[in-house]
C-alpha cells in the first residue's frame, strides 16, 4: 500500500508530465550540488530539473498516459520538465553534458511521444522556434515577391510583344 507521501509525490509528478511540453530523463551520478545548480540555471526559466525516485516516476508517467522504456529508470534519475521551448532546454542539457560527462541523457518525452537519447540530441541541434518561424516567414515573403514580379512581368511582356508586332506591321505596311 502506498503511503500518503508517495501518493502525493506520484500525483505531483503526474501533473508535471501532463503540464509539460517535454520531459528529459538524465542520470546525474557524480555531479556535485554546485554543478546541479549550474545545470538548473542553464535549462532556462521554463524548465524544472528534479531528482526523482524511479518507481514513482514510472508510475506517474503511466498515469499521465506515457509509456517509457524500463531502461530509462536504471540508476539515479533526474527529470527536466520543460514547459517552454523544448529545443532551448535540450540545448542546455546537451551543452552541460559536453562539459560534464557525468550527466548522461537517457531519453525523454516530447508532446506525449517517447524519445531516445539520440532524438533528444537531434532536438538540441534544431534552431529555436522563433528562428524557424522567421525563416518560414522570410521564405513566404520571398515567394510572394517572386509571384508579384511574375504577375508584373506578364502584362509588360504582352505589351512589348504587341508593340513589336505593331512595329513589324508598320514596317511591312510602309514597305508595300
UniProtKB/Swiss-Prot annotation:
Tell me which Pfam families the record gives: Ribosomal_L10
One term of GO molecular function: structural constituent of ribosome
Recorded GO cellular component terms are: cytosolic large ribosomal subunit
Q: Which Gene Ontology biological process is one annotated for this entry?
A: translation
The keyword Ribonucleoprotein appears for this protein: yes
Q: Which SUPFAM superfamilies match?
A: Ribosomal protein L10-like
Which InterPro entries does the record associate with it? Answer: Ribosomal_uL10, Ribosomal_uL10-like_sf, Ribosomal_uL10_bac, Ribosomal_uL10_bac_type, Ribosomal_uL10_CS_bac
Does the record bear RNA-binding in its keywords? yes
Sorted keywords for this record are: Ribonucleoprotein, Ribosomal protein, RNA-binding, rRNA-binding
As for what it does, the entry says: Forms part of the ribosomal stalk, playing a central role in the interaction of the ribosome with GTP-bound translation factors.
What does the record note on quaternary structure?
Part of the ribosomal stalk of the 50S ribosomal subunit. The N-terminus interacts with L11 and the large rRNA to form the base of the stalk. The C-terminus forms an elongated spine to which L12 dimers bind in a sequential fashion forming a multimeric L10(L12)X complex.
Q: Which family does it belong to?
A: Belongs to the universal ribosomal protein uL10 family.
Q: What is this protein called?
A: Large ribosomal subunit protein uL10
What is the organism field in this record?
A: Streptomyces coelicolor (strain ATCC BAA-471 / A3(2) / M145)
